[in-house]
Regions:
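Short, well-structured hydrophobic secondary-structure segments
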Residues: 24-29, 66-70
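Short loop/turn motifs at secondary-structure junctions
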Residues: 23, 38, 73-75
Length: 148
């Protein structure tokens, strides 16, 4: 199972909407305990391809995010990207470029602007795709300084 704070979902959604008409992308750092992956920090990266059909993360931003993940004692949970004009499922290119069977691949479809769809996937070494459950959580009051 993958846990994502609603606030982080909103952050990803906002980043992807601002990136339209192109795909947007980023990395996800967090913790892994048993079979539960908890996203603790979302890293919004630049799609240097500036394309609505594929993405390449800015290498400098990617390196900076990986350094921050390590400095915070997090693990690489996965990455995300948007599909501005297609469903929330891995394309053939997404599967081909999925290099690590241990991380999550999140895809946010903006095909229906009023009803975005975020799904998490695993891609094994044979390029078989598995849909993973996403649990949305709220920040605890002490994390925001306010009552929820």
């Amino acid at each position: 199972m993958l846990k994502l704070k609603k606030e982080d979902y909103e952050k990803i959604l906002d980043h992807c909407r601002k990136g339209l008409p192109n795909e947007s992308c980023g990395l996800l750092g967090g913790t892994i305990e048993d079979d539960v992956k908890t996203i603790e920090k979302v890293y919004l990266l630049t799609n240097i391809d500036e394309s609505n059909e594929h993405f390449s993360m800015d290498p400098k931003e990617q390196l900076s995010a990986i350094k921050d993940i390590r400095q915070n004692g997090y693990q690489m949970i996965g990455n995300f990207h948007s599909h501005p004009e297609s469903p929330s499922r891995p394309s053939e290119e997404d599967k081909r470029l999925a290099f690590d069977p241990n991380i999550e691949y999140l895809i946010l479809s903006l095909m229906d602007a009023e009803n975005p769809v975020l799904k998490a996937f695993g891609v094994d070494k044979e390029k078989n795709v598995t849909v993973h459950a996403v649990s949305y959580t709220h920040l605890r009051a002490h994390e925001t300084g306010r009552n929820l």
